[in-house]
């Protein structure tokens, strides 16, 4: 039986973080958590991290698609916050963002990890951006590091 598992130390990787400016007071904490995890735990040089700001979470997939198509990056981390309002707008934005990012990831064989919060209220978002519930940006970075290693191992098997 063959098993592929991987760690999170990735020294020579290039990563793009795409962050929404909408709800930036929350997203900046997610970004900070992601960068700290990539540099401190993953041992990635800051020069190897490209951070791109977009207006909102809905705009993340088009930039992710462009970046994935360049084939210059090992992973993409999507960061945004979608807070439920009084209409269904929340559901549409979240569903479209997640669906499109998943499709891009499988089309280009690039890990895209989700640091996108979908919460009922601002308090839940704050809690998930570095207080009671951890930092989902950091968790997305950890997933990206592990997936980079897994994808490298898969490529070695197929070459």
From Swiss-Prot:
Provide the GO biological process annotations.
Answer: riboflavin biosynthetic process
Provide the residue positions that the database annotates as binding 5-amino-6-(D-ribitylamino)uracil. 22, 57-59, 81-83, 114
Entry keywords, A to Z? Riboflavin biosynthesis, Transferase
* The keyword Transferase appears for this protein: yes
Q: In which pathway does it act?
A: Cofactor biosynthesis; riboflavin biosynthesis; riboflavin from 2-hydroxy-3-oxobutyl phosphate and 5-amino-6-(D-ribitylamino)uracil: step 1/2
Q: Which InterPro entries does UniProt cross-reference here?
A: LS, LS/RS, LS/RS_sf
What does UniProt give as GO cellular component?
Answer: cytosol; riboflavin synthase complex
- Molecular functions (GO terms): 6,7-dimethyl-8-ribityllumazine synthase activity
What family name appears in the similarity comment?
Answer: Belongs to the DMRL synthase family.
Record function comment:
Catalyzes the formation of 6,7-dimethyl-8-ribityllumazine by condensation of 5-amino-6-(D-ribitylamino)uracil with 3,4-dihydroxy-2-butanone 4-phosphate. This is the penultimate step in the biosynthesis of riboflavin.
Q: What is this protein called?
A: 6,7-dimethyl-8-ribityllumazine synthase
